[in-house]
Amino acid sequence: MAQVQYYGTGRRKSSVARVRLVPGDGKIVINNRDWEDYIPFAALREVIKQPLVATETLGNYDVLVNVRGGGYTGQAGAIRHGVARALLQVAPEYRPALKSAGLLTRDSRMKERKKPGLKGARRAPQFSKR
């Protein structure tokens, strides 16, 4: 018998996460590694759990993630977005809880590009009066 799986794609900065939710005991696997090994910061692990906590489904689903691009923060945000979208496929009645927590919105903030004549995106070269 084929097992039921729910899919969601999340994006944040330059990271893209493909998330699968499978009914289980709450294991989280990121790129075939345990999530505690993959993401060393407890605060970012809390970010990943937010959609499951908001819908009170923590421990009901195994979360299998394939994520690429970006750094720890971008990847954690992408996984959070993907988990929230996958939970909508599980049960559409989770939408109000996820929406009020702001978990369905794609965070569109990106790194601002460096401009010519400047040292960074906005930082100007040092100014000398004389």
Curated annotation (Swiss-Prot):
GO terms for biological process: translation. One of its GO terms (molecular function) is RNA binding. GO terms for cellular component: cytosolic small ribosomal subunit. Residues 105-130 are annotated as: Disordered. Signal peptide: none annotated. The keyword Translocase does not apply. Residues 111-130 have a biased composition (Basic residues). Belongs to the universal ribosomal protein uS9 family. PANTHER family: RIBOSOMAL PROTEIN S9, SMALL RIBOSOMAL SUBUNIT PROTEIN US9M. This is Small ribosomal subunit protein uS9. It comes from Listeria welshimeri serovar 6b (strain ATCC 35897 / DSM 20650 / CCUG 15529 / CIP 8149 / NCTC 11857 / SLCC 5334 / V8). The gene is rpsI.
